[in-house]
Amino acid sequence: MAALHTVIPVWLLTDIRRLVVTFAVALASGWGFLQIGIPAPYLMGSLFGVWIGGSLVKPLQPHLGVARWFHKPVVLGLGVLIGATFNQSVLDQAEKWSLTLVTMVVTTIIVTSIGYQFLRRFRGYDPRLAILCSVPGGQAEAIAMAREMVDRDYVVALFHLVRVVFVFVSTPLLLRLIEGQEAVNQSNIALQTMPSIADLPAMDIITFILLGVVGMLIARRLRIPMPHLIGPVGLSTLCHLMGWADLPRVNEFVILAQLAIGGAVGARLAKVPFGELLGYLKDACANTAVILTAYLLATVIIAKATGISFLAAWLAFVPGGLYEVTLLALVFGFDVAFVAFHHTVRVMLIFLSLPALALWLGGGSDGPSDKSSDKSGDRSSDKSSGSPPRG
C-alpha cells in the first residue's frame, strides 16, 4: 500500500475510494427505484440512497462524495446531450408553435422572477441561491450548475426535487392514474433500451468527446461563464441544427450522469442536519405551488385561445422532466415533437442565460468561491451548512 502511495497521490486515492463507495450505494439504490417504477430512478435513487445511507450510518459519511475532476466531464457530456435535442426536424415545425412558445417563455420568466423576489426579499436567500432555486426546469442540469456557483447546492436539489415530486403526482392524476404509471414504466424501459456505447460507431464516440472538449475550449477562449456546460451546449446545438452531427443518448452515460449528480448531492445532504433542511422545505413547497399554478393558468389560457387540447398544452408547459413528460405525451397520443420542443426551449433558455444572470446578481456567503484548486469535490462540503432562511 505504501508503494501505491508513492505512485498515486493520497488525495487521488481518497477520491477514488469515495467514488467507489458512493457509486456502490447509488447504483444499488437506483436499481431498486427502477424495479418499483420510480421516474428518473438512477437520479432519484442515488440521491435518496446516498443521503439516507449517510445520514443513518454516520461512519459512512467521510467515505461519500464525488470529486470535481470526475464531475466536470459528466457536465461536458450533459451539455452535448442537451444540444443534441435541437435538430432540423424540430426547428422546421417551430414556426407554427410560436404563440404557445412565447406564452411558455413569458410564463417561465414571470415564474422565475416571482420565485426569486419571494426567496430574496421575504426569505433572505442569497441572490445566486435564490435564482437557482427559482428556475422551473432541468433538474439534473440545475443541480450540476449549482455545484459550480453556490456552496449549498443541496438546497437547490431540494427545491427541484419537491417540484418534480409534485409534477409526477399531479400529472398522472390529470392524465388518469393508471396511464400515468404506464408512462413512468415506459420511461424506465426507454432508459434501459437506449443504445449502448458498445453499439455506437467509433466516429460517434469521437464526435461526442470532441463536441464536449472543443466546446469547452471555445467557451473558455471567449470567457463565457461556466464554459464546461455552456460551450458543449452551444457547439452541440450548432452541429445538430446544421446536420453535422446526430448523436443518440447513450445508456451508460445517461445512467452515469444520474449517479454522479445524484450521489454528489446525496453526500452533501447527508452531512446537513435534518432540522436545517426542514427550514428550506416550506420555501420549496411554496415556490413549487407558484410555479405549477402559473403554468396551469397559462395552459388554460392557451388552450382556450388556440383550441389545443388542455392536456397536450399542460404536458408541453409543466416543468417535470423532458424525457418523462415526452413519454407521457407518446402514451396519450399527443404531438411528441410539440411537447419536446417546448421543454427543450425552456431548458436551453434557462441554462444559456442563468450563468450570466447569476454572475450579474452576485451573492453573499453563497457567492462563488475559487474551488478550481480543490482536488476533491467533497472538501467544500464542510462549509455547506449555513443557517436556514428567516422564519
Per-region residue spans from a language model:
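Small-residue-rich segments of transmembrane alpha-helices in multi-pass membrane proteins
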Residues: K72-A84, T107-T108, I131-I143, V164-S170, ...
